[in-house]
């Protein structure tokens, strides 16, 4: 029987103190962290949940015994259809600032809480060379409108961010039977990518 791909990746994590940080865009990122947190606990890891807003409230209720950190993220807004491109471009300074802010905040958290590994669910700035850093996304190929050139540029930027991390976990299946379609399969996946199967809070 084939081993669960998520558990296979978790078995490769060195160190015991793991910080997991979901993006605060609704509850989707937080809910798909639930099976990851459960698998980490089963693997006898110490889990630190770093989030803000409703994701933090939700995960505190799901895992009341785990340590939590209020780790805020600056909201970025999408526009609609063609206006989405200009909306995203107008927010690039804010986007860049937020990545740098997260990056330096992570360094302080690592030293304060003795973190061995960080798992970031779509938070762009959480990589640090002194520890093992994992990025989770099902949307390798970011879609920001109907303009193929802009979508390709967004993919290349996202790929550059992803490759700052040691690993990229894609919550989908590779090849036939995948559910994310072009979001994860249109362009070549980053060299550090691993497909870990579908994630559900009911796993």
PLM segments and residue spans:
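A nucleotide-sugar donor-handling region in carbohydrate enzymes
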Residues: 2, 144-152, 158-203
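Conserved nucleotide-sugar phosphate-binding/catalytic loop shared by glycosyltransferases and other
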Residues: 7, 14-17, 23-24, 42-93
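Structural motif
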Residues: 17, 116-117, 167
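A short, glycine/small-residue-rich beta-strand->loop->alpha-helix junction that serves as a flexible
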Residues: 22-34
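Gly/Ala-rich phosphate-binding loop of Rossmann-like dinucleotide-binding domains
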Residues: 37, 41
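Residues in the short beta-alpha loop(s) of Rossmann-like NAD(P)-binding domains
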Residues: 53-55, 139, 174
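Conserved nucleotide-sugar donor-binding subdomain of glycosyltransferases
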Residues: 83-125
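Active-site proximal beta-strand in glycosyltransferases
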Residues: 129-145
């Amino acid at each position: 029987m084939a081993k669960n791909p998520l558990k296979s990746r978790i078995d490769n994590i060195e160190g015991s103190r793991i910080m997991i940080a979901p993006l605060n865009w609704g509850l989707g990122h937080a809910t798909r962290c639930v099976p990851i947190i459960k698998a980490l606990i089963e693997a006898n890891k110490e889990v630190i949940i770093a989030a803000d807003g409703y994701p933090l409230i939700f995960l505190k209720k799901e895992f009341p015994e785990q340590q939590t950190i209020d780790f805020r993220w600056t909201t970025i807004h999408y526009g609609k259809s063609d206006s989405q491109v200009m909306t995203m471009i107008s927010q690039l300074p804010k986007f860049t600032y937020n990545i740098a802010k997260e990056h330096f905040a992570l360094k302080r958290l690592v030293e304060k809480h003795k973190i061995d590994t960080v798992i970031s669910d779509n938070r762009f700035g959480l990589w640090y060379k002194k520890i093992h850093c994992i990025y989770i996304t099902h949307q390798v190929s970011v879609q920001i409108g109907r303009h193929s050139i802009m979508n390709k540029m967004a993919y290349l930027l996202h790929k550059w961010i992803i490759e700052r991390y040691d690993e990229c976990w894609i919550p989908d299946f590779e090849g036939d039977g995948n559910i994310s379609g072009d979001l994860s399969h249109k362009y070549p996946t980053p060299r550090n990518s691993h497909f870990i199967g579908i994630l559900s809070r009911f796993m």
